[in-house]
């Protein structure tokens, strides 16, 4: 068929409902704001790993759905999460991205979260323990017990990751993610892990476009090393398995690292209960990824910053018991594939940056195809069909026409 005119370009694709989406799901500000309320304020987010809070009074800060969050480790060794907001005048309490509250700061006492604005102080359980000039200003009208921090649901699970949920009554974390994690649970929980690598990317694209790259592998044609070494029968036989809540599991596969130019086999270093050179990938709705590949575990967490902007945080993890030599080997293996200058990750970022360039607020809507059917194997796009079907349910919008309320697609999302 020749190149199309505008009417043909905008026509409904000759596919079934559920095999394509309207690009407004990536570009519309109203839809984005609704996603924060209906999805990100209801979903469990793997905020950090517990190894990033190794000591009592350590803390980390971030945001979820535009809400500032602080996670602390108390003297009782419990990890807790709170809104990083003073209940007095709405001031941000802790401005640092990480640190320790064990020692005093210029604006606060040791072992306290102190709001520098008016010197209100809170302990590691979120209790208000000090109000400056309390009796003079409030007499007996405002007891400290009534102005504690806003606590959040927080659990440490699935290999020591710290999960936070803004909803007071969410689905349990076990029900949320237990089933897709079953394939790796024994491995991840066999012994303590710790983070050895962190970097982040802020990309002008929609967060869902990034997650798409982890839900399908048809784009491996973009990855040079995958294309020249990995396209074999075992690769194409891998299955994409769908789970409740929009999660995806990409089946195991033995990676032949010794076929990569300049690489050698990585069979000498793995994780407990995992055969050498194995590769598992768990994609969690709405945009988190756990990727265990041979000797290194990678975890991605997205923070949507707008319809056309996302922050992606990348962590590499190994075993806490690693010898210095083993740790350096894991770092080298991780960074050669997934580091900022590795042979894989930057190619994915180039791909979604290009999509973000053509799908921006104000541009006309486009039809984005998810219609490949290959018996749910690695180049089937069933992972994306499943994801957007669940997205439609959460949002009560049809992905193929977000102006319409959701109804089940004619084709199964698998």
Curated annotation (Swiss-Prot):
Query: What SUPFAM superfamilies does this protein map onto?
Result: Bet v1-like, ISP domain
Which UniProt keywords are given for this protein, alphabetically ordered?
A: 2Fe-2S, Cytoplasm, Iron, Iron-sulfur, Metal-binding, Monooxygenase, NAD, Oxidoreductase
A GO molecular function term, named singly, is: 2 iron, 2 sulfur cluster binding
Q: Which cofactor does it need?
A: [2Fe-2S] cluster; Fe cation
Highest taxon listed in the record's lineage: Bacteria
Which intervals hold domain Rieske?
44-163
Modes of activity regulation: MSAMO is inhibited by metal chelators (such as bathophenanthroline, bathocuprione, neocuprione, alpha-alpha-dipyridil and sodium EDTA) and by sodium azide, sodium arsenate and potassium cyanide.
What EC number(s) does this enzyme carry? 1.14.13.111
**Pfam families in the cross-refs:** Rieske, Ring_hydroxyl_A
Q: Where in the cell is it found?
A: Cytoplasm
Residues at which Fe cation binds: 225
Q: Which reaction does it catalyse?
A: methanesulfonate + NADH + O2 = sulfite + formaldehyde + NAD(+) + H2O
Q: Its induction, per UniProt?
A: The msmABCD operon is induced by methanesulfonic acid (MSA).
Coarsely, its chief localization is: cytoplasm
Uppermost EC category = oxidoreductase
Q: Specify which residues bind [2Fe-2S] cluster according to the UniProt entry for this protein.
A: 86, 88, 115, 118
Q: What CDD domains does the entry give?
A: RHO_alpha_C, Rieske_RO_Alpha_N
Q: How is the cofactor bound?
A: Binds 1 [2Fe-2S] cluster per subunit.
* Family of the protein in this entry: Belongs to the bacterial ring-hydroxylating dioxygenase alpha subunit family.
Q: How does this protein assemble?
A: The MSA monooxygenase system consists of 4 proteins: the 2 subunits of the hydroxylase component (MsmA and MsmB), a ferredoxin (MsmC) and a ferredoxin reductase (MsmD). The hydroxylase component consists of a 3 alpha (MsmA) and 3 beta (MsmB) subunits.
Query: What does the UniProt function comment say about this protein?
Result: Methanesulfonate monooxygenase (MSAMO) mediates the primary degradation of methanesulfonic acid (MSA) to produce formaldehyd and inorganic sulfite by initial hydroxylation of the carbon atom prior to spontaneous cleavage of the unstable hydroxymethanesulfonic acid. MSAMO has a restricted substrate range that includes only the short-chain aliphatic sulfonates (methane- to butanesulfonate) and excludes all larger molecules, such as arylsulfonates and aromatic sulfonates. All MSAMO components are required for enzyme activity.
Which protein is depicted?
Methanesulfonate monooxygenase hydroxylase subunit alpha
Name the species this protein comes from. Methylosulfonomonas methylovora
Give the gene name: msmA
């Amino acid at each position: 068929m020749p190149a199309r005119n505008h009417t043909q370009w905008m026509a409904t694709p000759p596919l079934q409902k559920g095999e394509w989406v309207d690009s407004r799901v990536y570009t519309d500000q109203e839809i984005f704001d609704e996603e924060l309320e209906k999805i990100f304020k209801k979903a469990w987010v793997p905020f950090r790993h517990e190894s990033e809070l190794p000591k009592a009074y350590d803390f980390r800060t971030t945001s979820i759905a535009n809400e500032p969050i602080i996670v602390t480790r108390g003297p009782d060794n419990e990890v807790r999460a709170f809104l990083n907001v003073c209940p007095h005048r709405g001031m941000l309490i802790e401005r640092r991205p990480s640190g320790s509250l064990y020692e005093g700061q210029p604006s606060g006492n040791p072992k306290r979260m102190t709001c520098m604005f008016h010197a209100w102080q809170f302990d590691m359980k979120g209790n208000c323990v000090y109000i400056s000039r309390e009796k003079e200003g409030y007499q007996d009208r405002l007891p400290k017990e009534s102005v504690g921090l806003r606590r959040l649901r927080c659990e440490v699970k699935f290999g020591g990751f710290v999960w936070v949920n803004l909803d007071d009554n969410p689905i349990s974390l076990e029900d949320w993610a237990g089933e897709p994690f079953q394939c790796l649970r024994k491995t991840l929980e066999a012994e303590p892990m710790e983070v050895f690598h962190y970097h982040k990317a802020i990309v002008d694209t929609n967060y869902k476009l990034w997650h798409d790259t982890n839900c399908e592998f048809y784009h491996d044609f973009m990855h040079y090393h995958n294309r020249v070494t990995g396209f074999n029968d075992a690769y194409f036989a891998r299955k994409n398995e769908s789970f409740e809540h929009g999660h995806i599991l990409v089946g195991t596969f033995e990676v032949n690292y010794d076929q990569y130019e300049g690489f050698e086999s990585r069979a000498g270093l793995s994780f407990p209960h995992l055969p050498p050179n194995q590769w598992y990938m768990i994609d969690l709705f709405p945009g988190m990824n756990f990727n265990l590949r041979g000797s290194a575990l990678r975890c991605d967490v997205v923070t949507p910053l707008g319809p056309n902007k996302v922050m992606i945080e990348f962590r590499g993890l190994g075993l806490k018991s690693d010898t210095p030599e083993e740790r350096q080997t894991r770092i080298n293996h991780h960074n050669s594939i997934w580091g900022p200058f590795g042979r894989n990750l930057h190619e994915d970022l180039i791909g979604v940056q290009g999509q973000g360039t053509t799908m921006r607020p104000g541009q006309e809507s486009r039809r984005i195809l998810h219609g490949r059917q290959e018996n749910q194997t690695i180049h089937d796009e069933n992972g994306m069909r499943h994801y957007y079907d669940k997205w439609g349910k959460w949002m009560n919008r049809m992905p193929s026409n977000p102006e319409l309320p959701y109804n089940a697609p004619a084709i199964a999302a698998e």
